[in-house]
Amino acid sequence: MSRPHRIAAGGITFRGNAVLLVRYRNSNGGTYLVGPGGALRDDENVIQAIVRETKEETAVTVRPRRVVVIEDLVCSRFKMSKVWMICEVVEGEVRGTEEAEKEGIIEAAWYTRDQLANEVVFPAALIQHDWAQLRSEHWQVKCLPSRKANF
């Protein structure tokens, strides 16, 4: 089955030993965690989309630094290619926002690696790779295998 394609961008933002993630409900009634992000608007690039989406979803302003992961997701209504960038916090504290609520986000928070043990997480690199390596300037961009997503 052919699906429309979507280009998206997301931020991987660390603070100490925790990463900034938002929680959604999936189509099966469970939940999943994902770095803040979303589809690019016609008038923006990947960096602008990450800054906008992170602010809308978490109230935190970030500065994207470098691409670390490219993810391909087969979703229920579209196929999505998503560019993930390591970001640094510029300002703000995590809190719920009106935009996040409208989008179906039920939580935004900082998560340690141990807290992700029994979670479905996007991008998978947050589970599959050492965070110190992911944050390193020597990290080589990874293109992840296609993955089915229940959203």
What label would you give each PLM region?
Residues 18-56:
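Conserved Nudix-box catalytic region and its N-terminal flanking loop in Nudix hydrolases
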Residues 8-9, 33, 106:
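Structural detector for hydrophobic anchor residues on beta-strands
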Residues 128-151:
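Charged phosphate-binding loop/patch that engages nucleotide di/tri-phosphates or the phosphate backbone
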